[in-house]
């Protein structure tokens, strides 16, 4: 308990709370509960829920934002760095900020079935999107799209030569900046 009082006094100038109050607040702040609900006969699903942060006049015994430097969401370092020798940032396949992609366009149900069949070729692509479509178009046909990403252009070319794409599906090659 002495450590808890020390932490509290370190981050707050007032030491009006008792040891029991500090311990109660720390416990409420740091614990999680698990709730179990019935899914079907004989099975259960467990969900973890976090306690909500204390609001109002009750202060936490320590202020974590004083120790942690916060940054904006869009400035998070994701380990992606661009190369300085790249001259065309929009279509450059050699830049580390772009990845080769393929858009598969066609009927939504056909694309969904194709995406499930692609599971056996997982080594030939990196990621596959869900079936999606552009929302603000005047096109009455409403063509659906599945986007596949690759680590290299070689992997994309190997995919396109190996996997049989149905005739009703249009293939568009390109790059996506990440």
Swiss-Prot record:
Keywords of this entry: Host nucleus
Recorded superkingdom: Viruses
Region of interest called Disordered, as start-end residue ranges on this chain: 40-60
Principal subcellular localisation of the protein: host cell
GO biological process: regulation of DNA replication
Gene Ontology MF term list: DNA binding; DNA-binding transcription factor activity
UniProt-annotated location(s): Host nucleus
Gene Ontology cellular component terms for the protein in this record: host cell nucleus
InterPro entries according to UniProt: E2/EBNA1_C_sf (IPR035975), Nucleotide-bd_a/b_plait_sf (IPR012677), Papillomavirus_E2_C (IPR000427)
Family: Belongs to the papillomaviridae E8^E2C protein family.
Main function: Plays a role in limiting the replication of viral DNA in keratinocytes. Recruits the host NCoR/SMRT complex to viral replication foci to mediate repression of both viral replication and transcription.
Protein name: Protein E8^E2C
